[in-house]
């Protein structure tokens, strides 16, 4: 139906990304296609070594999932920092990742986790890596008529450390800056590390160079500072009511420092 209606149609799930954009006239679709009645788009399941989450699964359902609590606790931690309970009851994971809003929390987490988005359209199905999905503010790799149907994440190893640290002005606000970290430790040193940054560029950021600096280290102060500098170097935040460019850049570094410390504490 979306493909038949063309570029003037938009899918509607929870509506917490699309409806505010429509109110601001940033989106002016002629048709809304409600996805609420498609049960195949909802649910959380294990598929071999992957966790698969349907696109219309709400943040409230992510918080309540025993599977995610065991396998991907960073998703629960992040969901609890999104907006407020009213929004979390309706807002969906698919809407959060597919909208392309640089202020949304889940895209950077998905980059951190190396997630893949399952996408469907009139031409069939395909998969797109989260790290290749975001092309600019509100611009993604989705073609007209395509929707994200599920998010696929490889289950991290037991004993991994994780954290999502978010600075915001008030409850329900977008991040001034935020950082997602997942790592594993071996004999007191970082064996693997992945980092995503939220709302400090036109897209979520994957801090690959910072990761490389940290692998093999004991997360000593000098190495962490070097990695933080590498992460700050890829940011390009807008100066807005959340603060000037320099402040938001430095807050990204502060959030990353905190996330690394917390992830290290949690790693076993």
What residue ranges belong to the model's regions?
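C-terminal structural segment of proteins
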Residues: 1-268
